[in-house]
């Protein structure tokens, strides 16, 4: 779930596909839903798994792209919680500042 700057809590879920690479994790569906509902600024993200698993690399990149520096609370069903920032999850993140403007490309 993600908490928006306005205090609204928005949830998501893991969407499985028989073609595993097309599966979309709950972190991404949560953020995509929030964006689709018009939210663009977030206070925190909570990731709940059975065993306290950390977000995958794709989710870490999307969290960084859409949230920048927010706390990410990772928890399991027994009550264990670990809080990291987006940059701790994805140090030296690749983002739009690493992209050259199109007009500078030799295309």
Regions found by a protein language model. Name each.
Residues 1-8:
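Short beta-strand scaffold segments in enzyme catalytic cores
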Residues 8-9, 81:
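Hydrophobic "anchor" residues
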Residues 11-12, 74:
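General beta-strand structural signal in soluble alpha/beta enzymes
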Residues 13-29:
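Compact, glycine-rich, soluble single-domain proteins
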Residues 24-43:
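Short, charged low-complexity linear segments at domain edges
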Residues 37-107:
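C-terminal binding/interaction regions
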